């Protein structure tokens, strides 16, 4: 006599929770296995890392040889005065803009690189 999967499922459905626990313990003993779920460590961190970054920081790493053009580009992007933009260019590495979209960060990077600066997006 062969028992089908459906018959086994029906038998499980008719059991109380205590009977199912006892059955599982008996199966663990008979087959030498454990019914404990495998724990995947770090799963939450990996899922967070997979999410696409939405805010970027544009970091000026060096002003390069054409300092005047870089200062003008900084002023245009940030609205800072001449003195503040000059101080920012001399303080490299420094964040020119923080929390901007990817498109805005790429556009600013392109503008600063064309002016002669070294730039990173983080």
Swiss-Prot record:
PANTHER family: 39S RIBOSOMAL PROTEIN L12 (PTHR45987), LARGE RIBOSOMAL SUBUNIT PROTEIN BL12M (PTHR45987:SF4). HAMAP family: Ribosomal_bL12 (MF_00368). Homodimer. Part of the ribosomal stalk of the 50S ribosomal subunit. Forms a multimeric L10(L12)X complex, where L10 forms an elongated spine to which 2 to 4 L12 dimers bind in a sequential fashion. Binds GTP-bound translation factors. This is Large ribosomal subunit protein bL12. The keyword Ribonucleoprotein applies. The gene is rplL. It holds the Pfam family Ribosomal_L12_N. GO terms for cellular component: cytosolic large ribosomal subunit. Forms part of the ribosomal stalk which helps the ribosome interact with GTP-bound translation factors. Is thus essential for accurate translation. The keyword Plastid does not apply. GO terms for biological process: translation. Keywords: Ribonucleoprotein, Ribosomal protein. It comes from the Bacteria.
């Amino acid at each position: 006599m062969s028992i089908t999967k459906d018959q086994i499922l029906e038998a499980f459905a008719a059991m109380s929770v205590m009977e199912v626990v006892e059955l599982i313990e008996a199966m663990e003993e008979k087959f030498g296995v454990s019914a404990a779920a495998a724990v995947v460590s770090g799963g939450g961190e990996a899922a967070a890392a997979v999410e696409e970054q939405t805010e970027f920081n544009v970091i000026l790493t060096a002003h390069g040889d054409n300092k005047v053009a870089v200062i003008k580009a900084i002023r245009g992007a940030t609205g800072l005065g001449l003195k503040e933009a000059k101080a920012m260019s001399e303080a490299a590495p420094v964040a020119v803009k923080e929390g901007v979209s990817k498109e805005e960060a790429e556009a600013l990077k392109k503008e600063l690189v064309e002016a002669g600066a070294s730039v990173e997006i983080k």
